[in-house]
Amino acid sequence: MPPEVMTVADDEVVVFHGPLATTWTDLPPDTELDLDGIEVRTLPRRGELLATVTTANDVHFGETVCGHIDGVDWETYAVAPGEAPYPETMNAAVVADMAARRPDAVVVKGDVTADGTDEQIDRFLEVYGGEFGDRLTWVRGNHESYHHQQRGAWPVQERTLDGVVLAVLDTSRDATINGHLSAEQLDWLDELGARADRPVLVFGHHPVWNPAEERRREGVFGLVPGDTEALVDVFARRPRLVGYFAGHTHRNNRVDLPGAGDVPFVEVGTVKDYPGSWAEYRVFDGLVLQVHRRVTAPAALDWSERTRGMFAGTYARYARGRLSDRCFAMEAR
């Protein structure tokens, strides 16, 4: 198995060989390096670190089987009798890894449950809220809204930290899998972009519609086309908005859309299976880094490796994405 460069920061690189990780720390920023034959460039840094934000999505408390797709006879994955449910294993590992970074804020952007039940949401809040308290901001995803769950259905949320503002949007619609933004939400984001005195990171569950991947129709997987275009218009008009960060697809991906300049529209992979993804945002003066991270606990890595073969062996490449999808720098506009 070839090495997988999972994390590149301004001072750190983590390379996995299957479940085994090699970590280099105290590296110089913005520098081409040869690390045991692996060529990589660290991300830039600008001044002192102002804030750290972590994010996760698609944590799926209550799920018991993964890899199932209706109408497709592919292998599915479940834990053995007596083993802890895999969402418990994976989320405990992610929470521990996040806590070690001492984040100023944590954003969980949807699909916190498998079935949208109150019991599953309570368990999510026990695990994430129990560790992070009032540093936690969360919003529902389609796994909640499909079942008409209204907890987490705040249309907009705003949080201000040193060097950055966090804007969180509820993109989910009741009884519907794909995403939507109302005129009121877009107006609010436009107004926030106009008054913000620092970079704004925008979070939601559903990724943008990408015309390079899907034809124009209302049944797209992510945000419907008209709302995607309206969101792009707001970003184009408000340079304080530096990026949009979503989940939903269970992959790491970055999309550049016409009319949005160099604004990244990002998808962060799922917590619950391979590779066990979450992301860290390092905020500097006029510069924000997205640093992808993979779970580190042995039990979580074991489950992650077991599930890399999902979808007839196609899942690992899809879910992992490119290094440039996972780790990159965003200049304040």
Regions found by a protein language model. Give the residues of each.
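His/acidic metal-ligating clusters that form di-metal
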Residues: V94-A105, T176-P264, T314-R333
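A short C-terminal boundary segment appended to hydrolase-like catalytic domains
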Residues: V15-F16, D285-R333
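Extended active-site neighborhood of metal-dependent phosphoesterases/phosphodiesterases
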Residues: R45, D118-A194, G222-L231, R240, ...
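Extracellular ectodomain segments of secreted/surface proteins
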Residues: M1-L20
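N-terminal active-site segment of His-dependent metallophosphoesterases
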Residues: D26-T117
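Acidic/histidine-rich helix-loop elements
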Residues: N57-T89, Y146-G152, D174-L181, R215-V220, ...
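Beta-strand-turn-beta hairpins that frame and shape the catalytic cleft
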Residues: L43-T54, G62-H68, E158-V168, R195-L201, ...
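Active-site environment of divalent metal-dependent phosphoester hydrolases
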Residues: G62-V65, A114-E119, H143-Q149, D174-I177, ...
